[in-house]
Amino acid sequence: MAGVVDTLSTVGRALQGALTGRQSYHLDVPAAPDAAALSVVSFEATERLGEPYRLKAVLTHPLELARENYLRKPATFRVTPADGSVPRLFSGWISQFSRTRTTRDFCAYEMELRPTVALLELTTASRIYQQKTALQIIESILRRHGLEGHQFAFRTRREYPEHKFRLQYQMTDWDFVRLLMEQEGLYSYFVPSRFGTHLGEVFTIADDIDHYIYQPALHVPYRETAGLESGAETVFSLQTHARTVAASFMAADYNPDHAYERLRDEANLAFNDKGNYGQPYVFGTHHLDWKGARWEAQLRHEAALAGQIVYEGESNVLELCPARILRMDAVLPDAPHGQVVTEVIHKGGRDQAYRNTYKAIPSGRRYRLPIDERKWPRIAGTLSGRISAPDRYKYAYLTGEGRYVVRFDFDFDAWRKGGESVPLRLAKPFAGGLKTGFHFPLLDGTEVAIAFHDGNPNRPYIAHALHNSVQPDLITHEGRWPSRNVIRTQRNNKLRMDDWEGHEGIKLSTEYGGKSQLNLGYLVDADSKQRGDGFELRTSGWGAIRAGKGVLISADDQPAASGQQLEMERVRSLLQQALQSSEALAEAARTAQAEAADCARQRALLDDTLDQLKRAGLLATAPAGMALASGADLQLSANENLIATATNHVDVSAIKRFTVAAGERISIFAQRLGIKLFAARGKVEIQAQRDEMRLMADQNITVTSANGRVVIEAKDELLLKCGGSYLRMSATGIEDGTRGERTIRSNGMARQGPASLAQSMNEMSRTAFNDAYVLRNEITGDPLSDHPYEILRDDGSKIVGVTDASGRTSVQKNQDVERIRIRILPKVGKA
């Protein structure tokens, strides 16, 4: 192999020596052993600010070349000036290799040379960048492609903001870098590496006029040609193109983190230029504050002004390159300090001397890449992702603003769990102020569809959630489920609405409290079999029904739910009938001098409280019957009156005792069929412990002892009267009298000395209500010692006293239950 290489090198040198004239263009490929024999027929190199250059060369070689020795191999193209000065170098790698012609004498080839950074054009990626500036993002991309720190450089003046989120989606790495430069006001160019051509050229990113290439100074004459060339470096053609651009720019956007106002500002960098007109308004520039709005407007105006005046020239100046400052002896009113080159197209060949065409702008203007937002990437539709939470957090992992972290399905980079994206907003069917909204939490692993505001990849939000094979839909084709509308949470809190025809129903349930449920309509069990209809409210925990204005519980039907909420005509009619019955019986009781029912109170209850629930009452009604049952005790209590009315019978039964106690009076009145009091066993005792007892009948009164005695006893006197005749018995004697005859029928009569029976009167027990009351300060609760008070009784009497050291009043002794009022009097000398 070494012999072949030596032979080819010898052939190459011989060919070069045999050529007439000098060879100014060379392509060096160190990895190709036969590259020395390459001869450049022609070349064209295109350089622009913000783009990797592209050099195409047509070459010949006496042999057929192996593709693998050239394609993707480092190479350097040299343009050597005729005066032997420093050559112009293009260092990079061969990106294209084509054999275009083969003859007996040579083979023709076309090759393309690109800089190292052009490798970024070959990699399409989707990647997320967080909490990085644009420069940091660009550096990370360059390093990912193997570029070292000496192969690129940043020369910037502006302080670049840190972006919370940037998305590269289905873009080549170079297109994404180019996009960042356009959006951030950056441009790029290449300079020779001081470490040698084998490392390529240095990719330089800059942002201001200070970073143009000023040294060494390039000052050339402007000389138009007349068909002849002197060979000296000159600019021999120059055109100036000017156009009207916008006089200013306005930029605005909405930032939900500063939702109180839309962020808007404008920029005018050429107040004195009267040739400009208009103010384009750009909305959606994704700035976060007022400073950002001003910068976005300024950037767009700088880009417009950079393209306002463009010079197009032709020259043979080999040093021309993007970002180079070019000065001429011609006067350019708009470029008193020279031009900055933005584009150069180099050409040359065997039959053509080197020359170039170039474009430039006044060097006093900041160069900005042309901004064409129509070409910026837009994501139509949505991307898939998964909700992400750290440490398998079992509830919704939310930020203070209610946002979620999402891992995009295209993203395979290593992120900490719960840090795969910035927190994203969730689009909801309803949202608003005053804490209004609609919220169902998204849990770790939930699939979501991610949309983008205006299609901007840098502005994602969660559009909705979806089911998948791992998290299947809760409603499928199984059974009767297609008719169901269901909301179900991870802990089986559920709202189910079934639209199956004829079996419509609603279920609201939670697992807590042993399945607390509200079931409406057609009630089914777990197997969808009917277990009832109507409604059911149940729980294994506590239950409470509260209504501050009143409660109506009714078993009266309202077909098709057509009536009013407090429809109660039927129950009001029943209560009115009951009231009328009570009033009739009360009138009869009053006629019989019995105690009448308090019908006025009953009417007030109906009219003032129960009717339409004018006050906070409870009304329960059932047309076919009602029952209250308790496994233990049942209590009915009223602070005022307890009223019970029946059109027919009132039946009260007690297996053991039946007690009735009244603080004042018990009145029992039977209008027609009388009263029966029976005791199958045990005594029947009737006592009037503090007053008289009267037994009265319109006809006979019978007192009978079937198997014992009848004892009638009185302490002072026993008096029997009938038709004027009488028998009076007392401790001092017996007296009888009659207006008619007195007949004594007996078998005999005995008269003996005085005698009497011992008195065995029953003593009446007294129920004493002896109470002392403690008066306390209503704020501190401390007893009011030695404090005057006044007690008012129901009979109008007053008792005035002073409390003792413990705040107690004097003992109040009463024979009966009695209401009293206690007034706390002011101490003497105090208000």
Give, region by region, the residue ranges found by the protein language model.
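Amphipathic alpha-helical and helix-coil boundary elements used as assembly
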Residues: 1-831
